[in-house]
Amino acid sequence: MKTATPILWDSPINSESIFESKKTISNLQAWKDGLLFLITEPSEGNINVLMYSDTNSDTKRVSPKGFNIRSKIHEYGGRPFTADGDDIFYCNFNDQEIYSQSFLSASNTFSSPVAVTDSHGDKVRYADLSIDRKRNRLIAVREDHRFIKTSVDEAKNSLIALALNTVELPTGTEAQTTLFEGSDFLSSPNISEDGENLAFTAWQHPNMPWDNTELIVAKIADEGHLYDVQKVDGNGDSSKTQPFFVTSKKLFFLSDESGYWNLRSCDLSFEQNDLKSENVYQIEADCCGPPWVTGKRNFSVINSCEVAISVVESCQWRLH
C-alpha cells in the first residue's frame, strides 16, 4: 500500500477536476418565445455566458467569447442584463461597460456587441437595467467610483437614464440623465408596462439591504424626469425588495415586516402622502434570501389571480 507524508501527499483530485464540469444556470428571463439565461462556462475560466433557448429548445450563445456578463456594483453584483423587442443590453465584467446586441430574425442570429457606454472603465459600474420603450432609453443603477480619493470616500449611487436614439453611442456619463440620487445605495428599478410609473429600493449606511430599505415610487413625466416621489410604508423598519408592477397602479414586492420576507402589494394613489401595503401571501417562511445581489426576482405573476413564488422551508427551496 502506498503511503505519504500528511499534507505532502500528491492527491489525484485538484480544484480543476472539481470545477471543470460544473455549470450553473441563473438569471432566467422570458424573451420572445423563448428564454434568456446565464450559464457559467468552466472552459473559459468560469465566466458568465448569455444564452438563448427558443421554443424548439434550440439553444444559441448570445455573448461572444471574451465577454463575461457580470456586474461589480455594490461589490456583490447585480442583475447584469435585460431584453425587450429585438434588443439585449448587458454589463461586461472586464470593463463594466454596457453593450447591446440585437436579434436578426432574417438570419436567426445575433449581431455583434456594440458599446452603449464609455464610462472610464470599471470606475463606473452599472446594474439592474430596465428598458423604457415609451422614451426609447435605458434606465439603470450607476455606481461611480471616480470620486474616491481617500479611504473615507465612498462611491456615489444614482438612478440614471441613457437615451438610445442617439447616433453618438457610446456615451459618457455627461450624456446620462440623473433621475434620482442622495441615497447611499439604490437597486431594482422597475417600470410599469405603460411607462407611467417607476419603483425602486434605496438604503443608507449603516443598514444592509436585509436590515432596512426604502421602497420608492414615482411618476415619470413625458419628458422623462420623476415627480410625485413617495415612499411605500414610510421609512419603517423593514427590508423591502424586488418591486414589480402588476398593473400601472398595483405594485408587488417582498417585505420582512412580519419577520419573514413575504409578498405584499400596494395600490398607488399619488393623491395620498402615506402609501401603505397589504399582505398578498403570508407564511412563516422566507420567500427570498438576503439580497446580497440586486435585481433578483423570487416571484412571477401568472395571471390576475395566481402568483408563483419560491419559499424556503426546512432549508429547502420549494415553489408555491
What are the language-model segments listed below?
Residues M1-T24, D54-Y76, Q101-R125, I160-S187, ...:
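Multi-bladed beta-propeller domains
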Residues A30-K32, A83-G85, I131-K134, E193-D194, ...:
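Residue-level detector of Asp-centered blade-edge/turn motifs that repeat once per structural unit
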Residues L36-G66:
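Beta-propeller domains
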Residues I39-V49, I69-E75, Y90-Y99, S119-R125, ...:
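A flexible loop/linker signature enriched in serine peptidases of the S9 family
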Residues G78-D86, V141, S300-V301:
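Repeat-blade elements of multi-bladed beta-propeller folds
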